[in-house]
Amino acid sequence: MRILWIVAVCLIGVEGNLYQFGKMIRYKTGKSALLSYSDYGCYCGWGGQGKPKDATDRCCFVHDCCYGRVNGCDPKLTIYSYSFENGDIVCGGDDSCKRAVCECDRVAAICFGENLNTYDKKYKNYPSSQCTETEQC
């Protein structure tokens, strides 16, 4: 039963916003979102706590805060309109909630791209037990 639940969650991610966010990350960084950012520092991945470990982790912290301000839809599942144009990510559509989610993802992907030099492999698979200090959005 647990395996079916995991497969269902993965399929939702493939169809929903997490897949779109991953495409934005790849576009701005050239890296796989799943392999490079899914479990990095204290904030990159599901959930988050503590103080961001570096500028890359801070991108995830700011992204989590941005998702926390979105009202009217589930940011992790919302499918939105966007395009890649001349090196930029452009959010589209008339739905304000979908557009807000897209903007959160766009800003985070740009942040990752601007902070590629701070990415430190020692923070990959970083233990959450080391994320003890607190920081507010």
Curated annotation (Swiss-Prot):
Any GO MF annotation of the entry: calcium ion binding
Signal sequence bounds: 1-16
Cofactor, free-text remark: Binds 1 Ca(2+) ion.
Binding site for Ca(2+): 43, 45, 47, 64
Compartment(s) of residence: Secreted
Enzyme class: hydrolase
Keyword Ribonucleoprotein: no
UniProt cofactor(s): Ca(2+)
Catalytic reaction list: a 1,2-diacyl-sn-glycero-3-phosphocholine + H2O = a 1-acyl-sn-glycero-3-phosphocholine + a fatty acid + H(+)
EC number: 3.1.1.4
Pfam families according to UniProt: Phospholip_A2_1
Tissues expressed in: Expressed by the venom gland.
CDD domains: PLA2c
Active site: 63, 105
Gene Ontology annotations for the cellular component aspect, listed alphabetically: extracellular region
Single GO BP term: lipid catabolic process
Function: Snake venom phospholipase A2 that causes internal bleeding, shows very strong anticoagulant activities and inhibits ADP-induced platelet aggregation. Shows very low cytotoxicity. Is not able (or very weakly) to suppress the acetylcholine (ACh)-evoked current mediated by alpha-7-similar nAChRs in L.stagnalis neurons (IC(50)>30 uM) and to compete with alpha-bungarotoxin for binding to muscle- and alpha-7 neuronal nAChR types, as well as to AChBPs.
Family classification: Belongs to the phospholipase A2 family. Group II subfamily. D49 sub-subfamily.
Name this protein carries in UniProt: Acidic phospholipase A2 Vur-PL2B
Origin species: Vipera renardi (Steppe viper)
